[in-house]
Amino acid sequence: MVDAGHEPSPWIPAPIRWGVLAVLTVLFVGIGFQQARLDAPAVDEGVDVSSGVAALVHRDLRMVPEHPALPKALAALPALLAGPVVPESEAWHEGEWFNWSDDFVAANEDAGSLDATFLWARLVVVAQGVAIAALLYALASRFFGPDGGLVAAAAWLTTPYFVGLGHFAMLDVPFTLAALALVLVTLRWLARPTLARTAAGGAVLGLALATRHTGLVLAVWVVLVVVVKLRSRPFEALQGLVVVGLVSVLCLWAVYRGLSPSGPPPEVTARFEGLVATQTSSVAVGLVGAMPRPLEWQAGVASMGQAGTNRPASLAGQSWSGGRWWYFPVAAVLKLPAGLLAAVLAGWVVARRHPARLRLAGVVLAPALSLWFVVLVQPLNLGLRVVLPSVALALVGLGALVAPVRARLAPGPVEPATGARRLARPAVLGVVGLVMASQVAAMVTAAPHSLAWSPPPFRPAYRWVSDSNVDVGQALYEVRDWVVRHDQPFVAVGSTRGLTVGGGSRELVGADPADVQ
């Protein structure tokens, strides 16, 4: 179904369209699996995977407060096939989740189960990356037809940065999936606001809240959509808000009590309540406190408030502490293919003339910009990955590029299809093929270091970008191999908690410059 209700039938034959998507999906999965198998655990993966495994094994969420539990538990579910060691160390009993992550990672490295555990967890995220492509296809198709859906999905599947992030068991990909799913469900509700679709929207919103706390931004957006859509029918608007709120909260509770039926034990409850008490001045914590919410989830909001302090960051040769408003736009230029960025901008310019442009702005751009703004005002420039949902939603605009080519070259109602007009179908196929060829070339040449890839001329990447724009600790195993071939080298490398370089290496940070020389 096309949202505008007037788009012509697709020009790219369905067998070609589905064949292209199948090939790109196989490449995405194949490259993702290769890197999931070879890369060392990322910095955030240690905490996320260990806490997810603990939640499933002990039915206890004491190790989950910093971020919601759902994506961790989903990734941990197949990871149990590796038979991970789940130590009940002092850190476990004290609820020190970072220290317990150290214990988990170290114990599984010693037992030889670490790599298998993380590989199984990462396969879940690879599958979620494919699901994101499917949602982008569905979203763009509703506005621009199947050809537009093909372009949007292909852009996601072939961009090196997305491929690089798409195999790490962190929260960025799952939350992007949740955000896109909520946008699609909301579009369907706008087309026909039935009670069943209202409840479905509430369910997806609840899952988004159980995936990342910034899902609260999406909750505000959903409220505004319902109010605007039903503004002439206030009783129905109130009914819709009640249904969305009730179902979303029930889903949130279902996730948390499904994982921890008895709730946190008394000592953990006291610790979580103390964490919340330290953030009483926080508006977000206060609003969440007024909700009927699981304590573990509220403690996560408070924990994020504690973590939201100025941190060192750098980009394009500049370094600072805190946040910069220009960080994410510049990071996008330094990490994403120039052709893709130009196409996205051109697509949204063309989309301004779309008959459904207001709905496109309200249902695609509004949540994308809202999520972007919330991250922008935080003093944490941790990498482009934290605005991944916004970047993914921006890809929907690529679908608009198919329409002007088709309109210019298609036969008019009277004029015969002569001259250039006879080239319409080959031209559309050629444009799409050229974009895809350049994207696939970047995708293939970036492997097996997709995350570290940057487009020319911003190479080598580490001279231009830092943090998760280039490195999340995935190269630790390669650094270890390098250390073995050198005599006590000085090393500075990020790695997940519980892992060290070893091999006789010396710490570069804090070393005497005379010794390094």
What are these regions (language model features)?
Residues M1-I31, V130-A134, S141-R142, V151, ...:
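Start-transfer (signal-anchor) and selected internal transmembrane alpha helices
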Residues A22-T25, V220, V226-V227, L241-L250, ...:
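Signature aromatic-anchored transmembrane alpha helix within multi-pass, membrane-resident enzymes
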Residues L123-F143, A181, V185, V349-R353:
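Transmembrane-helix motifs of polytopic, lipid-linked glycan transferases
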